[in-house]
């Protein structure tokens, strides 16, 4: 009997990670539909998976960045500048797509919802100020709280100082980085079970009924994200590399977007992205920095969410939106999106900042935020999938473009 069970399990264990995750998704959907009570009880699997990813991500980023900079050889190229440029362009283009879609497919909201809790930031200047202050947070607190801006700042500083250290010291840092990476690979092997628990619990708990009332709004948001993922991002990559972008696009969607969709956290998906970059053969010195940095500032999905819901609120209140204001909204959404990294549903709390451009009161804006939380089961998942997969996509594009230039 045991050998028969082993014969059934062995093919599953020998499958690749993506087929295993696909099976986990299907099993989670079936369990939620057939036995919803049981589905809620397996949520522990999903919680354990997300907790493990969030726990290992800060120390992984710290070790990888420190090791990459400490062992960086003078004259050895990195491609961070190109990645940063792509991050900025991608986020701004996503905001423009969202604004255009909102004009073509205008939506309205039913603003009769209870107040929701949250402390939206007071303005763009405050967001930038908080971003700078977070960079000088106590390093121990940064590791405990998952503050990746501070982690990056301290890791870069320590790595630069260790360049003057002994070879043995740098080798210890490198070995520590490899050891933590091994733990991450072990955690990722449990992704199919974790996603099975997340899917089953989400569908059993929320269902699809809550999504139907705001189907048009959700369709515009998700449609914009799909358009960015499948049209504008590939176009940006093509213009940067002059190569067919779609093999790389689909590799990033398979390897990063699926897990990000269910973890709903760019920070939790950092280990997955680092593993994917390694499989794609990218420059470790580049992706060790660009991936955690992208989880903080590359927020195309958040820019889309903020823009679409803000314009829906303006339409509901009958506020006319002219072209200069729409253009300003694109810029504000892009900058504001940088302040929501690693927070499930964080982009929704930036909506009051954007609605203030149209003179919408905070009370009404927070009701709009409440609508965002209703659709967040799909919106936040899709947003994170776009954000996280784009981190790898633009990192790969910058690395490959640089390789072509260097070989020419």
Swiss-Prot record:
GO terms for cellular component: plasma membrane. InterPro entries: Na-dicarboxylate_symporter, Na:dicarbo_symporter_sf, Ser_Thr_transp_SstT. GO terms for biological process: serine transport; threonine transport. GO terms for molecular function: neutral L-amino acid:sodium symporter activity. Its main location: membrane. It holds the Pfam family SDF. It catalyses: L-serine(in) + Na(+)(in) = L-serine(out) + Na(+)(out); L-threonine(in) + Na(+)(in) = L-threonine(out) + Na(+)(out). It is a multi-pass membrane protein. The chain crosses the membrane at residues 15-35, 49-69, 85-105, 142-162, 192-212, 218-238, 246-268, 289-309, 317-337, 362-382. NCBIfam families: PRK13628.1. Involved in the import of serine and threonine into the cell, with the concomitant import of sodium (symport system). This is Serine/threonine transporter SstT. It comes from Marinobacter nauticus (strain ATCC 700491 / DSM 11845 / VT8) (Marinobacter aquaeolei). The gene is sstT.
């Amino acid at each position: 009997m045991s050998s028969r069970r082993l014969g059934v399990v062995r093919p599953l264990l020998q499958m690749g990670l993506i087929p295993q995750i696909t099976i986990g998704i299907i099993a989670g959907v079936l369990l939620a539909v057939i036995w919803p009570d049981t589905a809620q009880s397996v949520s522990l699997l999903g919680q354990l998976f997300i907790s493990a990813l969030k726990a290992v991500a800060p120390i992984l980023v710290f070790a990888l960045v420190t090791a990459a900079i400490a062992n960086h050889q003078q004259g050895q190229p990195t491609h961070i500048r190109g990645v940063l440029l792509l991050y900025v362009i991608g986020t701004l283009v996503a905001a423009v797509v969202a604004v255009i879609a909102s004009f073509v497919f205008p939506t309205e909201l039913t603003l009769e919802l209870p107040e929701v809790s949250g402390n939206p930031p007071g303005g763009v200047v405050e967001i930038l100020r908080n971003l700078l202050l977070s960079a000088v947070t106590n390093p121990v607190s940064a590791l405990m709280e998952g503050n990746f801006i501070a982690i990056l700042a301290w890791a870069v500083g320590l790595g630069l100082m260790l360049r003057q250290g002994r070879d043995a010291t740098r080798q210890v840092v490198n070995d520590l980085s490899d050891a933590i990476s091994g733990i991450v690979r072990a955690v990722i092997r449990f992704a199919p079970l974790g996603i099975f628990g997340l899917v089953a619990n989400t569908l059993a708990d929320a269902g699809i009924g809550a999504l139907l009332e705001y189907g048009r709004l959700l369709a515009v948001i998700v449609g914009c994200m799909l358009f960015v993922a499948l049209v504008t991002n590939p176009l940006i990559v093509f213009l940067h590399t002059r190569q067919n972008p779609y093999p790389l696009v689909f590799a990033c969607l398979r390897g990063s977007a699926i897990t990000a969709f269910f973890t709903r956290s760019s920070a939790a998906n950092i280990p997955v992205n680092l593993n994917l970059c390694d499989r794609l053969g990218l420059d470790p010195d580049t992706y060790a920095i660009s991936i955690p940095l992208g989880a903080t500032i590359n927020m195309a999905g958040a820019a889309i969410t903020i823009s679409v819901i803000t314009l829906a609120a303006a339409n509901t209140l009958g506020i006319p939106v002219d072209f200069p204001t729409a253009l300003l909204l694109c810029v504000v959404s892009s900058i504001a999106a940088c302040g929501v990294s690693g927070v499930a549903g964080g982009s929704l709390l930036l909506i009051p900042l954007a609605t203030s451009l149209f003179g919408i009161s905070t009370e009404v804006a927070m009701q709009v935020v409440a609508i965002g939380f209703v659709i967040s089961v799909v919106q936040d998942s899709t947003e994170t999938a776009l954000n996280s997969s784009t981190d790898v996509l633009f990192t790969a594009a910058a690395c490959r473009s640089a390789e072509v230039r260097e070989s020419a």
